[in-house]
């Protein structure tokens, strides 16, 4: 699963979700992509499940790019622990996504195959997404 090799601080604050995605709003590598329509957290397990779903459907044809990286740690206290006594230990890693962010890109496959593969991957996420095609930017 994806996670940073090292970070400056082990624990982070929750942060804000407001606004649209600042970067990765266009398809830069592939021909087709999956774009978010909602804001939320995407865990490293969800990203890995999407990657496996796309690769299993496309088999050996095509190339896949993952455009998100889980760089935010989420802490959790042990079960049946009383409140207080500080913040919990880091439990898992998430990527903060806002509307407009490209999550995955696919190339060298037909539109139907790309659409099917990305639809299967979208079922693994907890946020709404849409299928997008590459547009030429000037």
UniProtKB/Swiss-Prot annotation:
PROSITE patterns: RIBOSOMAL_L16_1, RIBOSOMAL_L16_2. The keyword Transferase does not apply. One of its GO terms (biological process) is translation. CDD domains: Ribosomal_L16_L10e. Keywords: Ribonucleoprotein, Ribosomal protein, RNA-binding, rRNA-binding, tRNA-binding. Gene3D superfamilies: Ribosomal protein L10e/L16. GO terms for cellular component: cytosolic large ribosomal subunit. InterPro entries: Ribosomal_uL16 (IPR047873), Ribosomal_uL16_bact-type (IPR000114), Ribosomal_uL16_CS (IPR020798), Ribosomal_uL16_dom (IPR016180), Ribosomal_uL16_sf (IPR036920). Pfam families: Ribosomal_L16 (PF00252). One of its GO terms (molecular function) is tRNA binding. Belongs to the universal ribosomal protein uL16 family. PANTHER family: 50S/60S RIBOSOMAL PROTEIN L16, LARGE RIBOSOMAL SUBUNIT PROTEIN UL16M. Binds 23S rRNA and is also seen to make contacts with the A and possibly P site tRNAs. Part of the 50S ribosomal subunit. This is Large ribosomal subunit protein uL16. It comes from Chlamydia felis (strain Fe/C-56) (Chlamydophila felis).
